[in-house]
Every structure is written in structure tokens, then in C-alpha cells.
Amino acid sequence: MTDVTVERIDTLKTGDLHDLCDAADDAVKAGGGFGWVAPPAREIMERYWKGVLVVPERILFVGRLDGVIAGSAQLVKPARNNEAQAHAATLTTSFVAPWARCHGLARRLTVAVEEEARASGFRVLNLDVRETQRRQPSRCTRIWASAVGARIPSMRWWTAKGWPDISM
């Protein structure tokens, strides 16, 4: 039986940085680049993940498959001086490596971020999806609705180059 877990982490244990970079590298190559079109040099990716852990407005969640980091998601809180957006956080860098998909990690990561956002008092959780990920908006909506046990009563739609983008 496959062991699937999600946890909030504040430090990277031995091997975690390597696993996180490997999973992110695989996800970027598969088109889920959360800002990268091609994987950056390993040193850059390592610095990125180390940096995430020291930014107070970022909370990192990792998904593990049999103890190996296979995906992540972050809750990003607004800057303290952003009074107008103080009610809204962002779910970002959400990915699962291709080799770890279909085990429920995306759903569990989404639930963890959503629960943390709600516990922190946020009323809005934003999710941005890249235009090249045309199937992602409906997939993300299904994962979110499934994760929180909700039906989507209404959404705001914008058209960007001929396809719908969803803001929840």
C-alpha cells in the first residue's frame, strides 16, 4: 500500500531539498512550471526552496509518496502593508511530479492550504493558472470543490486569448 501524506514544513530534513528539487524539476518538464518554462539550474532551484522557508508570508506544504517529497503547494499571505488585500491569500507553486500523480496528492495539498488559509482568517484564496495549462482551470475547480466538499454556485470568468480563466 502506498503511503500518501501532506505536511507543513518549516525546515528541510536531510534529503528533502534533493527530493523537492527533483519533483519540481519533473513537474516543470511536464509543463507545470509555476513560473518556470524550463527547469532552472539546480543551484537556483535549491536557493528558491531555501528562500521560501525564510519568507514569513510563505507557508510551504509538501506531499510525500512513501516518504519521498513528490509535490508541494504554498500559501502566500499578503504583505502586511497591503490593507486592501488583507482578506486574500494565494495558493501558489502547487504541483505533483508526474510519477506521483493519481494518488490524491493534489487534493490533499489543496485541502491543507485551504484549511490553513481559513484558520488564518482569509476569506479569499486566489489561484493563478498559466495560459498554456488550458485544462487546469476546470481540473483545479474540481479538486477544490472535492477538497472542501462544495458545489461551485458561481464563478467569475475572464477570457484570455479565447479560453476561460477562473477566479474563485
Curated annotation (Swiss-Prot):
One family name in Pfam for this protein: Acetyltransf_1
Tagged with keyword Plastid: no
Native source organism of the sequence: Azospirillum brasilense
Keyword Transcription: no
Domain N-acetyltransferase as annotated: residue spans: 7-168
Organism domain of life: Bacteria
Regions annotated as coiled coil: none
InterPro entries assigned: Acyl_CoA_acyltransferase, GNAT_dom
EC code(s) of this entry: 2.3.1.-
Keyword line: Acyltransferase, Transferase
A Gene Ontology molecular function term of the record: acyltransferase activity, transferring groups other than amino-acyl groups
Identification of the protein by name: Uncharacterized N-acetyltransferase in hisH-hisA intergenic region
